[in-house]
Amino acid sequence: RHIHVSQEDFRFLFGEDAQLHYTKELSQPGQYLCQERLTVKGPKGEYQNMALLGPFRKETQVELSLTDTRKIGLPGVIRQSGDTTGSPGCTLIGPKGELTIDHGVIVAKRHIHMTPADAVTLKVKDNDEVFVLTKSYGRALIYADVVVRVDWSYRLAMHVDTDEANAFSNQTEPYGVIVKFFDGNYNTDKWIEDVLSGINR
């Protein structure tokens, strides 16, 4: 769980002269963990000391797992990063004030970052949806609906939330195999219905 914050909201919560303080680099170039922390409050609970990621975004976005959203009483809306229209809001509590946002809380859709060169090698393209088969110890998983995100600024990495990561019991050698069906354009629910219809005939 983490927060991307706009500069305007950050200054309201931390003070007009406050700045983000770099702690460490993240998997994607230019993205970093910050020293600053916020409390995220929903109708039924709150999470304290939630990490902020830099740099500033145009719009504040809170990313939680489905378990997290249930704990604080918010609907879990699965979206790609940046797609926050119609998502639930929350209250952000900082050292200098409280701010209620009317949208911006999402459960991030699982995705893979890669460069255009990676995409050519892996035979995928931007916004394809693929399956990822993972190696594990008694709990191998097949992740479906994994969005491919392609840009020269990215570094090859798959991002899942804590719920998805905890279901996958391989912390020492986490890797997966990308499998692309239907030219990367499919609807899992429809596909499952078709399979079940065939079984039930």
Name these PLM-found stretches.
Residues 1-43, 48-95, 100-133, 144-175:
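Short beta-strand-centered segments at strand-helix junctions
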Residues 98, 136-139, 182-185:
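Short, charged beta-turn/beta-strand-edge "cap" motif at the junction between a beta-strand
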Residues 143-144, 189:
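Short, well-ordered secondary-structure micro-motifs
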Residues 167-175, 179-192:
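Mixed-charge, glycine-accented linear interaction segment located at domain edges/termini
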Residues 191-201:
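Helix-rich terminal scaffold detector
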